[in-house]
Structures are given as structure tokens and as C-alpha cells.
Amino acid sequence: WIMGHMVNKIEQINEFLDLGANSIEVDIAFDELGYPEYTYHGVPCDCKRYCTKSEKIDDFIEALSAATTPGNPKFRKELTLVVFDLKTGGFDASRMYKSGKAFAELIQFSYWKGSDDAGRAYIVLSLPKLDHYEFIKAFREHFDTSTFKNLLEERVGYDFSGNEDMGLTRVVLNKAGVNDREHVWQGDGITNCILRSLDRVKAAVAIRDSATGYINKVYFWTIQAYSSVSDALNAEVDGIMTNEPDVIANVLKEDAFKDRFRLATYRDNPWETFKR
């Protein structure tokens, strides 16, 4: 998956897809009570990027639903996966459960439109800290008595992006009600302004490939330098988050990679661990 980073304006959806992305990351900002309010990253962010682009949450989710609904004039078949980078550090932790419920309602009614036929992209809920796990728990429990529980079970995955201990990550996911390998993505990375080793990525890949692991997919963020992309691919990641999707697309065409990797399509299940 080529994961377009910090896609927070409606027009950026097509911009990043046109550059070769098949996935986007969207930053979700919340009000002080934990209700989703708008798309926004804020400073600091990445080098050579504007950090303050924003949309009202309802407007962006409406556009995102259109872009991922077959038959809609704005449908883009390339967009198969959306990572919601949930900025849950801006409100009191006591509101985490209610915030997860509110976001579940937003997805059910504004993205899925209360229908099995709208908003087909797979979703990854990405939390910045392990102690925010009640957001995931609440999101899942919202659908326990819903007729749309099948969409939760088919289309929603989970990630913690804070580069915390992976053994503890497994424990916390289980506390949130997520079983081992139940749609678990594991990210590792840092702003593109700073070089980061692949040590933790390689550890995550080893867990993914272990018979007793809990991870389905591993991704690295945020890179676009040719050497960094090559190194990440050689480490066997499943996704790369980037500001320049065309760079990753071009690297995938190189002789060293063209027979080992291909761009994921909607037929590729992001919850299945790939076996070579």
C-alpha cells in the first residue's frame, strides 16, 4: 500500500491518488469533549509540507464516502484503504470512551451512509498512545447491537502509532477487545525531517511472520527518499506512508522490486498476513 500522508483537504484526495497512492492517511482533530470536529494536523509536521490544511469533518467524510462508493460520479477505485490518524491527545482521557462512540456514529452514518453499499474502503483506526485504547473499545462496542456489525468485522482495523513497546501493544489491543491478528496494523516511523533506523520495523515484521504473532501488516512512515524506500521494501513492509506517492510507485517498478511487490487492489485483503 502506498499511503498518502496528511490528506486533510478534499482536493488532496484526488491529488494523492493521481500521484500513485492507493491509500490515504487523514488527521482527525477533536473538540475538548472528544467529538470529531475537523481534519487537521497542525505544527510541527513534515519537512516541505503545509501543516495547517483543514476541512470541517462532515464535509471531508462526505467527500471521502463519495470517492469510495462505486457508482458515484466521484468514485476512485484506486482508494482502497483509509488510515484515520486520531488526534486523541487534545481532550481529557475520561472522554475517550465517549469519543470512540461518537466516531463510530460518524463512520456509520456519514461514511457508510447507513448502507452496505457506500464507503467501501477499508479503515484503520490509528491511536497515538496505548492508554487511549478505550477509544477502540467504544468504537467496537457501538456496533455490538447494530445491524452494521458485519461492516465492522469486514472493514475496520487497528493501529497504535506512538512507537511504544510491541509486547504491551498486544496486551492493550486484547484489552480493547481486539484478538491477535484481528485486523492489526503496526506502524513505525518518524517525521521525514529525521532519519530513523529500521530496527523496530524489522522487529514488527518478525512478529508478523511468527506463528504466534499478533500483527497482520507492518508499515513505515514518513519517507520518500529512494534509499529509504528501497530499505523499507527490503525489510518486507506491507505499506509505506509518504508525502510523494510517485516516488514509491517508481521504486516498485525497479528491477529489484517489480517481481517481488505489486500495488494492492481492492481484492487484496488488508487483514490477511501475506506469505511468500
Swiss-Prot record:
Report the locations given in the UniProt record.
Secreted
Record InterPro entries: PLC-like_Pdiesterase_TIM-brl
One CC-aspect GO term: extracellular region
Disulfide bond annotation, renumbered to this chain: 45-51, 47-193
Q: What EC number(s) does the entry state?
A: 4.6.1.-
Against Gene3D superfamilies, the record matches this protein to: Phosphatidylinositol (PI) phosphodiesterase
Residues of the active site are 5, 41
Functional description taken from the UniProt entry: Dermonecrotic toxins cleave the phosphodiester linkage between the phosphate and headgroup of certain phospholipids (sphingolipid and lysolipid substrates), forming an alcohol (often choline) and a cyclic phosphate. This toxin acts on sphingomyelin (SM). It may also act on ceramide phosphoethanolamine (CPE), lysophosphatidylcholine (LPC) and lysophosphatidylethanolamine (LPE), but not on lysophosphatidylserine (LPS), and lysophosphatidylglycerol (LPG). It acts by transphosphatidylation, releasing exclusively cyclic phosphate products as second products.
Q: Which family is it part of? A: Belongs to the arthropod phospholipase D family. Class II subfamily.
**Could you tell me what this protein is called?**
Dermonecrotic toxin LlSicTox-alphaIV2ii
